[in-house]
Amino acid sequence: MPYQIENRPPDLRERMYFPEIIRGIGAVTKHFLRNLFFTRDKNPDILERRRGEFGWADNVTLQYPEERAPYPPGYRGLHRLVPREDGRARCVACYMCATACPAQCIYIEAGEYADDPIEKYPVKFVIDELRCIVCGFCVEACPKDAIRMDSGEHTPPSYERGAQIWDEKRLLRGPPVSYQYDPWLRRGSPSIPAEKLEEMRARARPFSTVATDEYAQTPGFSVRALAQEAKDRAERAK
């Protein structure tokens, strides 16, 4: 049942704002004293070096960019496409990541292998990092563990917006990964030599390791332009 609340008019003490002013000064003073006399950095290596240099300096200033604080384990960095052992992308162009993306920043064009018509691969795989809201839905939706955000890198600075649009050449990086349930390991592939296929099967594992590397400096494209180009081709085909 709804009830009505009567709003009383503020008294003189509240209209003068003295309690709020004192409360704000107290909060500023508390943080000032804490930062002046107590440490803010929990890294023991940095703390030990600072104490060795200054003796009393527990309040640590991180000398960026020479010193960088490590990202937490769950940090969502830049995207990367996970490669297979043979260098191809694990992506099968199922469009699940593009469908799950709420920002619609992923554009994919699918193609088929000439020697394996059952499986598809991304002819174009483009991510607009400026539109990305870093929700991680694409990673969760991928059934092949083909896209990850474990690079540990944030978006690099750039003077042009087009430099933040990453294509498949720039995204395909990191250590190769194979799983025991990969279909190309079970049925084989004519384009992969038998020795290489056996090596891939031997290295296949239920879980993969995470590693990072530097991203390739490959120029990207515009996601909207690619989508419009595909739409125009479809209309011309009609």
Curated annotation (Swiss-Prot):
It is a peripheral membrane protein. GO terms for cellular component: plasma membrane. It catalyses: a quinone + NADH + 5 H(+)(in) = a quinol + NAD(+) + 4 H(+)(out). [4Fe-4S] cluster 1 binds at C91, C94, C97, C142. It is found in: Cell inner membrane. It comes from the Bacteria. Its cofactor is [4Fe-4S] cluster. GO terms for molecular function: 4 iron, 4 sulfur cluster binding; iron ion binding; NADH:ubiquinone reductase (non-electrogenic) activity; quinone binding. The keyword Cell inner membrane applies. Binds 2 [4Fe-4S] clusters per subunit. Residues 81-111, 123-152 form the 4Fe-4S ferredoxin-type domain. PROSITE patterns: 4FE4S_FER_1 (PS00198), 4FE4S_FER_2 (PS51379). Pfam families: Fer4. InterPro entries: 4Fe4S_Fe-S-bd, 4Fe4S_Fe_S_CS, NADH_quinone_OxRdtase_chainI. Its EC number is 7.1.1.-. Keywords: 4Fe-4S, Cell inner membrane, Cell membrane, Iron, Iron-sulfur, Membrane, Metal-binding, NAD, Quinone, Repeat, Translocase, Ubiquinone. [4Fe-4S] cluster 2 binds at C101, C132, C135, C138. Its main location: membrane. Belongs to the complex I 23 kDa subunit family. HAMAP family: NDH1_NuoI. NDH-1 shuttles electrons from NADH, via FMN and iron-sulfur (Fe-S) centers, to quinones in the respiratory chain. The immediate electron acceptor for the enzyme in this species is believed to be ubiquinone. Couples the redox reaction to proton translocation (for every two electrons transferred, four hydrogen ions are translocated across the cytoplasmic membrane), and thus conserves the redox energy in a proton gradient. NDH-1 is composed of 14 different subunits. Subunits NuoA, H, J, K, L, M, N constitute the membrane sector of the complex. This is NADH-quinone oxidoreductase subunit I. The gene is nuoI.
